[in-house]
UniProtKB/Swiss-Prot annotation:
GO biological process entries: translation
Ranges annotated as biased composition (Basic residues): 63-72
NCBIfam families referenced in this protein's UniProt entry, alphabetically: rplD_bact
InterPro entries membership: Ribosomal_uL4, Ribosomal_uL4-like, Ribosomal_uL4_dom_sf
Designated name of the protein: Large ribosomal subunit protein uL4
Function: One of the primary rRNA binding proteins, this protein initially binds near the 5'-end of the 23S rRNA. It is important during the early stages of 50S assembly. It makes multiple contacts with different domains of the 23S rRNA in the assembled 50S subunit and ribosome. Forms part of the polypeptide exit tunnel.
Gene name of the encoded protein: rplD
Region (Disordered): 50-77
Span of the signal peptide: none
Keywords for this protein: Ribonucleoprotein, Ribosomal protein, RNA-binding, rRNA-binding
Amino acid sequence: MAKLKVIQFDGSFKGEIQPANHLLLKKAVIQPVFDAILLEQAACRQGTHSTLTKGEVSGGGKKPYKQKHTGKARQGSIRNPHYVGGGVVFGPKPNRNYKLKLNKKAYQLALTSAFAQKLNNNQVIVAEAKLFEQTNAKTKKMLTFLKNAKLTEQKLLFVIDTISKPLLLSTNNLKQIVVKQFNKVSVRDLLLAKTIIIEKAAFTKLEERLK
């Protein structure tokens, strides 16, 4: 694995960083990564999908019309499922817990494997200290940086040490950029990003997290 280059605001590179040895995975570990993705996606489900049954629909306390001599089929309630606005038969109810379980070691391995593959594919760039602050909370300056770095058409993941208000404001209107703290980066975040730009301080702490 080659050393990681440190990018400047003008798009040039100055300095290098050597990744830790435990990130030198030669082959991706597929199964833990797959399980971690399922875990993360299941955790996003709110479980609020619900329909009303015949007993829960309002109205229909009496027969809509008399039993006989109407020329129509007999009906007992407008809450019956075949009526428009009636109850739903076998509809979804939020009585299921969608959360999955995965051992901590397996999830850690999935994170390490996903990040290591990005390193092996030269898809990780280290940002110099306070690079993102140079945008001054301006989207235009962030676009200038992306243009200088030739990253305007890519889905990007910015990994930071601490929450930076100028960075959030400068990327808020750029849908191709996801900003995450080093301790909140998920396997899905790593895999979806075409290029990862990570602060120096965040890179050191992320290495510790992935040990």
